[in-house]
Amino acid sequence: MAKYVIGSAWPYVQTVPHLGNLIGSVLSADVYARYLRLRGHDVVFVSGSDMHGTPIEVEAIQLGVDPADYAAKMHNIVAELFKRWDISFDLYTHTHSDVHIKFVQDFFLKIYNNGYIFTREEEVPYCPRDRIYLPDRFIIGRCPYCGYERARGDQCENCGRLLDPKQLVEPRCAICGSKPEWRLTRHWYLDLRRLEDRIRRYVEENPHLPPNAKEMSLGMLKEGLKPRAITRDNRWGIPAPFPGAEGKTIYVWFEAVLGYISAVAELKGEEGLRRYWKSPDTKIVFFVGKDNIPFHVIILPALLLANGDGYALPTTTASTEYLLYEGDKFSKSRRWGIWIDEALQLMPPDYWRFVLVYMRPENRDTNFTWQAALEVINKVLNDDVGNYVNRVLTLIKNRMGGAVPPPGTPAKEDEDFVAKATDLFKKAERHYDAIELKDALHAVVEIAREGNRYLNARAPWDLLRRDRESANAVMYRAYWSLKMLAAGLTPVTPRSAEELWRMLGVRQPSWEEAYKPPEAGAPLGEVKPLFRKYTEEEVKNLLKRLEELRSQKAARRYPWEQALL
């Protein structure tokens, strides 16, 4: 039994996450954590709401509400939505907890005392009307690259370029629209140059990093790491603990990545930190979208090395490409995409989970379309998987006494089928181990496809009339393949898999159970269809329903009122 810390990127809670956010981090992490638990491993799966930083502060100011109240309300909503998506966190916390705040301040003080932090002055935008500095999203203007009129001070949403506020054309305060002035301020910097060689070794010698994470990180290292400011002049955030840093907060990206550690401390205490985060035997795995790679592969390891308190470096960062919606990026401002609260108003979570993992953007951007989703649900989930389950179990239930038949005397075709199903199950296992979740699910589905071909070829309904021994042999092995199917589906569609285990009469599901020959005579549970189809007309009605829901949301002022629960 191995030890694992699994972490999914902490979502900003200025709004509800969308489907791209979900598959890029939280859902993928949940699938992997569920798989590891099914294998019997010791798993701690943590994440939480990123409650600080400029997105929340800007939105709160514009709405005239307190950022702490805003963030707390949205945290509760997002936490509840993740429960409804069956995300199996051991702890879903937030970055404004007492544990996290104290941990971050103590952690950075240690880095400061170790000599890896220095100060320097720089010019930053300041709004004289609102009397605040304008970091990151507090300032907007025209992008110098693509001309987008509402580019932010840290990045252009339209073309994706990283920006500095001084690059913006006609910059203005995001709150009041005033032209900013430039003022000198002092900030505290992490000296990444002193850590560069050790980070390079970590990246180059890490066999577990996926190609996109390794390539992006090596590209940054080739350009040379520069000192990064770890403080901001925000009012909302964790107060910087350094001498002379009164009125400063820790930059949100630098404190949020420490949440993976503070969450384990909150859940397991100091002993838990030693057991999971300070043990060389622990495998630490993060799940993020590709835009979060630098902070997990470069920044967090740098912080751990600079702290010097014996924390293990992450084993890998499983990073996806982007999920597009009908050919374009998800966009809140353009209402383009589907958000996780909306999705659950349209279909049950297992349908969404299956579709998203089946289409997971592992190696390249993937385009979610309703036509493709409908095909996955109807042809793959229902026809291939659900139909095979129903064919096997209804035949055993209705014509073989409702119990697992004896193994009979197998023909070569029967032995070949078990060998094929087992090979596919082992293939799924290898892909799950390698965090190739889409390929794992495809291998699981192939078990059902092989099963349908096997039933068609052997026709056990005919064998029952003339050769009971052969019929027993066929259905015994078909039942066995359903145990493999149930185990393979458990991480992806937990509710449906639980129902399948129940129908199979298996009381203690595990991955290893799938390898065990069935117990002849064991009774089945009540058999009923696992999945259903959706017609094109139903999808049209779902999209109509989506527009109605959005009209209701648009009429509500506050984001926590707009969320659909």
Swiss-Prot record:
Under Gene Ontology molecular function, one entry of this record is: ATP binding
Which coenzyme or cofactor does it need? Zn(2+)
Q: Which GO terms describe its biological process?
A: methionyl-tRNA aminoacylation
Quote the record's cofactor note. Binds 1 zinc ion per subunit.
Q: Which UniProt keywords apply?
A: Aminoacyl-tRNA synthetase, ATP-binding, Cytoplasm, Ligase, Metal-binding, Nucleotide-binding, Protein biosynthesis, Zinc
InterPro entries for this protein: Anticodon_Met, Met-tRNA_ligase_1, Met-tRNA_synth, Methionyl/Leucyl_tRNA_Synth, MetRS_core, MetRS_Zn, Rossmann-like_a/b/a_fold, tRNAsynth_Ia_anticodon-bd
One Pfam family this sequence matches: tRNA-synt_1g
Annotated Zn(2+) binding sites: 143, 146, 156, 159
CDD domains (UniProt xref): Anticodon_Ia_Met, MetRS_core
What does the record give as the reaction this protein catalyses? tRNA(Met) + L-methionine + ATP = L-methionyl-tRNA(Met) + AMP + diphosphate
Short sequence motif named 'HIGH' region, residue ranges: 11-21
Enzyme Commission no = 6.1.1.10
Major localization class:
cytoplasm
Concerning SUPFAM superfamilies, the annotation shows: Anticodon-binding domain of a subclass of class I aminoacyl-tRNA synthetases, Methionyl-tRNA synthetase (MetRS), Zn-domain, Nucleotidylyl transferase
Where is the protein found, in the record's own terms?
Cytoplasm
A cellular component term, taken from the record's GO annotations: cytosol
Provide the residue positions that the database annotates as binding ATP. Answer: 332
Q: Where is this motif: 'KMSKS' region?
A: 329-333
Cited HAMAP family: Met_tRNA_synth_type1
Q: What does this protein do?
A: Is required not only for elongation of protein synthesis but also for the initiation of all mRNA translation through initiator tRNA(fMet) aminoacylation.
Indicate the family of this protein. Answer: Belongs to the class-I aminoacyl-tRNA synthetase family. MetG type 1 subfamily.
**Under which name does UniProt file this protein?**
Methionine--tRNA ligase
The source organism is Pyrobaculum neutrophilum (strain DSM 2338 / JCM 9278 / NBRC 100436 / V24Sta) (Thermoproteus neutrophilus)
